[in-house]
């Protein structure tokens, strides 16, 4: 949720953010009205409760002649208090709904627009000239790394088996990511992949894209699309000690996405699938430290991309493609030879206080006063990276060179048919 002080003091900033995202700025006015109505309802209920309390005291001191009228007055006030509290509850509910409807306020400089309106910040490496490149699925099948046919037989479309060296390659990639994370002060976590609705809602994943999330209706639980979700809920309703600096966690988990809005997109191979594995960095920090932590997350992602030796670029994601929780997001996109374009491998988002406010995650400032923490997240490795590794390191004979950093995990320098 956004900061109400910002809303009240400078609603135009929030309206501008909504417009840049392609979202309705009228929601800002609806929230302002709901905020006013809520505060009015709270004040009315408080005043009536005070009046009721005073009337009750008068009853105890009243003479026999005065008592009947005062008792009637107390009874009337009790009914009014009951009605006022119901009105307050209704106003609170309307306010919460209006508050939850507004996305995080973007940072100044974030490009306006949608998916195609990003700004390229940096390009690293030169794509290698490959004559008649094979795509990752053709390579994966010929090398015995990927089995889409049996994945579909067992589970349906967009499912797959990673087999033999393919499984070793993914495990090696994820282990390398955990090594980078631990060396940089992250605590490694293997979190649950089923979460309660309040945690999924608190992280912002039950808004406009709720249809992307798998729900187990019988248990009212959700399968996570990223370990960002359980890691964000890890410190819900807590006051953290951040006096020694940010708390950094790296979550290794399977992830699940319905890809409901992706019909017809990336139907071949493992670029867009329903289940994959990922190591996700997640950080709790003071708001004033968040931008520096964001750059650090991006730096660790660059370190991982350098390790797999693929050309990539860094983009500043446009406001309409951020997701509701992020105030700024950087994507690292790797070159995919068969598509002659760059495809997303990592994202890192600065969610400022948006998620922590929803989940009531706080820290104590220098004066001991509780304040809302900031949260950030960023991919350190995921299954999709196999696409970039296989395609960029393919050889004319159909083999694939294993990046040096992954050789100890795969136990070979070349994957051969």
Curated annotation (Swiss-Prot):
Homology family: Belongs to the class-II aminoacyl-tRNA synthetase family. Type-1 seryl-tRNA synthetase subfamily.
Keywords for this protein: Aminoacyl-tRNA synthetase, ATP-binding, Cytoplasm, Ligase, Nucleotide-binding, Protein biosynthesis
Binding, ATP: 257-259, 273, 344-347
Gene Ontology MF terms: ATP binding; serine-tRNA ligase activity
Pathway info: Aminoacyl-tRNA biosynthesis; selenocysteinyl-tRNA(Sec) biosynthesis; L-seryl-tRNA(Sec) from L-serine and tRNA(Sec): step 1/1
Role description: Catalyzes the attachment of serine to tRNA(Ser). Is also able to aminoacylate tRNA(Sec) with serine, to form the misacylated tRNA L-seryl-tRNA(Sec), which will be further converted into selenocysteinyl-tRNA(Sec).
Compartments where located: Cytoplasm
Comment on protein domains: Consists of two distinct domains, a catalytic core and a N-terminal extension that is involved in tRNA binding.
Listed name of the protein: Serine--tRNA ligase
UniProt cross-references to InterPro entries, sorted A to Z: aa-tRNA-synt_IIb (IPR002314), aa-tRNA-synth_II (IPR006195), aa-tRNA-synth_II/BPL/LPL (IPR045864), Ser-tRNA-ligase_type_1 (IPR002317), Ser-tRNA-synth_1_N (IPR015866), SerRS_1_N_sf (IPR042103), SerRS_core (IPR033729), tRNA-bd_arm (IPR010978)
Disulfide cross-links: none
Keyword Zinc found: no
Keyword flag Aminoacyl-tRNA synthetase: yes
Reaction(s) this enzyme catalyzes, per UniProt: tRNA(Ser) + L-serine + ATP = L-seryl-tRNA(Ser) + AMP + diphosphate + H(+); tRNA(Sec) + L-serine + ATP = L-seryl-tRNA(Sec) + AMP + diphosphate + H(+)
Lineage: Bacteria, Bacillati, Actinomycetota, Actinomycetes, Mycobacteriales
Entries under Gene3D superfamilies matching the protein: Bira Bifunctional Protein, Domain 2, Serine-tRNA synthetase, tRNA binding domain
One of the GO BP terms on file: seryl-tRNA aminoacylation
């Amino acid at each position: 949720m956004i900061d109400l002080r910002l809303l009240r003091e400078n609603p135009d900033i929030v309206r501008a953010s909504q417009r840049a995202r392609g979202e309705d700025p009228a929601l800002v006015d609806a929230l302002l009205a709901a905020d006013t109505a809520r505060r009015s309802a709270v004040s009315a209920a408080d005043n009536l409760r005070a009046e009721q309390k005073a009337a009750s005291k008068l009853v105890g001191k009243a003479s026999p002649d005065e008592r009947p009228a005062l008792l009637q007055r107390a009874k009337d006030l009790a009914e009014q208090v009951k009605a006022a509290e119901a009105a307050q509850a209704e106003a609170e509910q309307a306010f919460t709904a209006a508050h939850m409807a507004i996305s995080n306020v973007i940072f100044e400089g974030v490009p306006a627009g949608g998916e195609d309106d990003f700004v390229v910040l940096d390009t690293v490496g030169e794509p290698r000239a490959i004559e008649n490149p094979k795509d990752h699925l053709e390579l994966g099948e010929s090398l015995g790394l990927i089995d889409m046919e049996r994945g579909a037989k067992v589970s349906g479309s967009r499912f797959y088996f990673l087999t033999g060296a393919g499984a070793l390659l993914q495990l090696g990639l994820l282990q390398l990511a955990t090594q980078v994370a631990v060396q940089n002060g992250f605590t490694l976590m293997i979190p649950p992949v089923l979460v309660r609705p309040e945690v999924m809602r608190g992280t912002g994943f039950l808004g406009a894209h709720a249809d992307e999330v798998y729900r187990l209706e019988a248990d009212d639980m959700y399968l996570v699309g990223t370990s960002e979700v359980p890691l964000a809920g890890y410190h819900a309703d807590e006051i953290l000690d951040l006096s020694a600096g940010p708390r950094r966690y790296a979550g290794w988990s399977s992830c699940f996405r319905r890809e409901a809005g992706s019909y017809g997109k990336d139907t071949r191979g493992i670029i867009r699938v329903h289940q994959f594995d990922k190591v996700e960095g997640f950080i709790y920090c003071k708001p004033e430290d968040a931008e520096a932590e964001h750059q650090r997350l991006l730096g660790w992602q660059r370190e991982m991309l350098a390790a797999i030796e693929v050309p990539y670029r860094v983009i500043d994601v446009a406001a309409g493609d951020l997701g509701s929780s992020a105030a700024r997001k950087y994507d690292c996109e790797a070159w995919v030879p068969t598509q002659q374009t760059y495809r997303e491998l990592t994202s890192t988002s600065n969610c400022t206080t948006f998620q922590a406010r929803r989940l009531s995650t706080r820290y104590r400032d220098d004066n001991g006063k509780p304040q809302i923490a900031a949260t950030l997240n960023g991919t350190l490795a995921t299954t999709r990276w196999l696409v970039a590794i296989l395609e960029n390191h393919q050889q004319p004979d159909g083999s694939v060179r294993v990046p040096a950093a992954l050789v100890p995990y795969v136990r070979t320098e070349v994957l051969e048919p």
